[in-house]
């Protein structure tokens, strides 16, 4: 599926401001200001300055929470977004109940205790982010994520993403589920991308971020076959 740019000149703007460059700027800025996030049972609230808030928006990390403070901005991050910034980019700090979580193991265990499928979803999220896709929540489409080639203000999302694992949820177990998902994503001009996240059996690492090394990600795009596309031209003899 070709990118569907939202306005004339959007493609040129995207080429002039690649996502990887903006993420690099964000990483540098957050590291210098020692941005601090506060972990709750469902998300992370990150306290930043106006400049960092703008960079986070350009990179599509989190959502702005409206507050009364003029100088401070509060950004609500999902667990996957927060751990990516903490573990992969190493540019923010996070605390829980007033105590700073000094290493990734503490944060990993805390997030895993709050969200049962955190490991699988984070592996899928980081897999896509590492390929410079913009990753957002897919809740409104009944999927885990939606992904964009660039900022959503420039281009429409191309894929609706479902994350599957062995022994995980029961989605896409029967043909009717697959048919419904494909029809739904097709109705909003997206392709259905299924990420199969599987791991080797290694119980010693399950509570550690090191277990991410044992996961593999297989990508599979599912599309609806249209008979009209393969019919012969009726005018031919």
UniProtKB/Swiss-Prot annotation:
A GO term from the CC aspect: nucleus
Gene3D superfamilies to which the protein is assigned, alphabetical: 3.40.1350.10
Subcellular location: Nucleus
Keywords from the UniProt entry: Lyase, mRNA processing, Nucleus, tRNA processing
Active site, renumbered: 148, 156, 190
Impact when changing residue 167 to S: In strain: cv. Landsberg erecta
Enzyme class at the top of the EC tree: lyase
Keyword Thylakoid tagged: no
GO molecular function terms noted in the UniProt entry: lyase activity; nucleic acid binding; tRNA-intron endonuclease activity
Superkingdom field: Eukaryota
BP terms from Gene Ontology: mRNA processing; tRNA splicing, via endonucleolytic cleavage and ligation
Effect upon mutating residue 27 to Q: In strain: cv. Landsberg erecta
UniProt-listed Enzyme Commission number(s): 4.6.1.16
InterPro entries: tRNA_endonuc-like_dom_sf, tRNA_intron_Endo_cat-like_sf, tRNA_intron_Endonuc_cat-like, tRNA_intron_Endonuc_N, tRNA_splic
UniProt xrefs under Pfam families: tRNA_int_endo (PF01974), tRNA_int_endo_N (PF02778)
Reaction catalysis annotation: pretRNA = a 3'-half-tRNA molecule with a 5'-OH end + a 5'-half-tRNA molecule with a 2',3'-cyclic phosphate end + an intron with a 2',3'-cyclic phosphate and a 5'-hydroxyl terminus
Family per record: Belongs to the tRNA-intron endonuclease family.
Role summary: Constitutes one of the two catalytic subunit of the tRNA-splicing endonuclease complex, a complex responsible for identification and cleavage of the splice sites in pre-tRNA. It cleaves pre-tRNA at the 5'- and 3'-splice sites to release the intron. The products are an intron and two tRNA half-molecules bearing 2',3'-cyclic phosphate and 5'-OH termini. There are no conserved sequences at the splice sites, but the intron is invariably located at the same site in the gene, placing the splice sites an invariant distance from the constant structural features of the tRNA body.
Protein name per Swiss-Prot or TrEMBL: tRNA-splicing endonuclease subunit Sen2-1
Organism field: Arabidopsis thaliana (Mouse-ear cress)
């Amino acid at each position: 599926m070709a990118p569907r740019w939202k306005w004339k000149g959007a493609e040129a703007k995207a080429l002039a401001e690649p996502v990887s460059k903006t993420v690099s700027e964000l990483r540098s800025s957050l590291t210098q200001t020692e941005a601090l996030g506060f972990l709750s049972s469902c998300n992370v609230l990150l306290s930043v300055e106006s400049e960092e808030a703008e960079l986070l928006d350009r990179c599509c990390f989190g959502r702005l929470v409206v507050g009364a403070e003029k100088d401070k901005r509060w950004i609500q991050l999902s667990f996957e977004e927060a751990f990516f910034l903490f573990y992969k980019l190493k540019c923010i700090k996070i605390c829980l109940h007033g105590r700073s979580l000094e290493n990734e193991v503490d944060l990993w265990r805390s997030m895993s205790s709050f969200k049962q499928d955190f490991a699988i979803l984070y592996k899928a999220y980081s897999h896509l982010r590492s390929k410079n896709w913009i990753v957002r929540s897919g809740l409104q489409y009944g999927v885990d994520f939606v992904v964009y080639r660039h900022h959503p203000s420039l281009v429409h999302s191309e894929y609706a993403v479902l994350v599957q694992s062995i022994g995980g949820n029961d989605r896409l177990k029967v043909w009717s589920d697959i048919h419904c998902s494909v029809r739904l994503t097709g109705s909003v001009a997206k392709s259905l991308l299924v990420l199969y996240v599987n791991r080797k059996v290694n119980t010693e690492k399950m509570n550690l971020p090191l277990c991410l090394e044992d996961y593999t990600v297989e990508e599979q795009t599912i599309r609806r076959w249209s008979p009209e596309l393969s019919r012969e031209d009726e005018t031919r003899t």
